[in-house]
Swiss-Prot record:
UniProt GO molecular function: ATP binding; single-stranded DNA binding
Residues engaged in binding ATP: G30, D31, N32, G33, A34, G35, K36, T37
Subcellular location: Cytoplasm
Keywords associated with the record: ATP-binding, Cytoplasm, DNA damage, DNA repair, DNA replication, DNA-binding, Nucleotide-binding, SOS response
Name of this protein: DNA replication and repair protein RecF
Length: 362
């Protein structure tokens, strides 16, 4: 898929701006604070329902405005015969939102997020590797959400059961009142875990070749999965039953896929905690690119790739390796930087350039 038009209104420095990206490589340059990242934020907001720099109400809306608006028009479909044009709009006040997709009102942000797929690498992406388990769970679930149509319903089923069980635990409910939700949590949780495990196994097969190209010195060799309970010993139903007294005392559910995690393993390093910040960024980028390649294989089209401030996040050598990998694929890319990243010349990439200044994009 590739974005043909992106319109932004009342978002950070932008009062009104519109750009028409090329279908391949797009570079947005400008001084620090000019608004380059805000363009990617707008696209990310439509694809994820949130900014990668915080909540909508935490500074994303232009000062003095009541809300922001983003409109995206894009083509999707893996072949000319199957291509179609799609349009989505989102108005967000930080508290309330309204959205439209292909001329119809949408009741859930998930409908917009399911339509437009964007893989974003930005200065905070290292938390995928160096942070806690939540971003890694989101990473898995994003991939499943976009390649398995029924995954969202399964995920919502599990989350609903978890919320209900936790509410009962906080109320000090009697054990028999937990039985129905334990059954629902165990049934949906086992299925959710199986999906995540299969996806991670598939992703590992894509990740290792990507990592070998863009960061061979890391020696990334495997991904391991921790399901959130001792699955090799007991079923989730049994784990919930065994932990019931402790959960009632603590007021929350201690076992299940909401506590799952995964970890990269390296031939030359003892583990993710031994990574420098730069190595964590490279590992995160390799994971994101592997996820994009998996999306392309499963959906027969590439997601949009957004790379924020690539020149300062990676040195010239690694920039060239990343871009050389990407320019060989029919993916639309939007890259920001204060200047043309040196690695672009090394990768031999043709680009469409935009300049961002004083709240305008030229």
């Amino acid at each position: 898929m590739h974005v043909m038009r992106l319109s932004i209104h009342r978002l950070r420095r932008f009062q009104t701006v519109e750009l028409h990206p090329a279908s391949a490589l797009n570079l947005l340059t400008g001084d620090n604070g000019a608004g380059k990242t805000s363009v990617l934020e707008a696209l990310h907001l439509m694809a994820y329902g949130r900014s990668f720099r915080g909540r909508v109400r935490d500074g994303l809306i232009q000062q003095g405005a009541n809300d922001l608006e983003v409109f995206v028009e894009w083509k999707e479909g893996g072949s000319a015969a199957g291509e179609r044009t799609r349009r989505a709009g989102l108005r967000h006040s930080g508290q309330e939102w309204t959205g439209r997709l292909d001329g119809e009102d949408v009741a859930q942000l998930g409908s917009l997020c399911a339509a437009l797929a964007v893989v974003t690498f930005e200065p905070g992406s290292h938390v995928l590797i160096s942070g806690g388990g939540e971003p890694r769970r989101r990473f898995l679930d994003w991939g499943l959400f976009h390649v398995e149509p029924d995954f969202l319903a399964l995920w919502r089923r599990y989350v609903r059961a978890l919320k209900q069980r936790n509410a009962l635990l906080k109320q000090g409910a009697q054990p028999r009142m937990l039985d129905a939700w334990d059954h629902e949590l165990a049934e949906s949780g086992e299925t959710l875990t199986s999906r995540r495990m299969r996806y991670l196994e598939r992703l590992q097969d894509r990740l290792i070749p990507v990592a070998d190209v863009i960061a061979p010195s890391l020696g990334l060799s495997a991904l391991t999965f921790a399901p959130g309970w001792k699955r090799h010993e007991v079923s989730l139903a049994d784990a919930l039953l065994l932990a019931r007294d402790r959960d009632r005392q603590n007021g929350y559910t201690s076992q299940g896929p909401h506590r799952a995690d995964w970890m990269p393993h390296f031939d030359v390093l003892p583990g993710k905690d031994a990574l420098s910040r730069g190595q964590a960024k490279l590992t995160a980028l390799a994971c994101l690119l592997a996820q994009a390649e998996d999306f392309a294989f499963e959906r027969s089209e590439w997601p949009v790739i957004a790379l924020d401030d690539l020149g300062s996040e990676l040195d010239r050598h690694h920039q060239a390796r990343v871009l050389h990998r990407l320019v060989s694929a029919p993916a639309q890319m939007l890259i920001t930087g204060t200047e043309i990243p040196p690695g672009l010349a090394d990768a031999g990439a043709l680009l469409h350039r935009f300049h961002v200044e004083h709240g305008q994009v030229d």
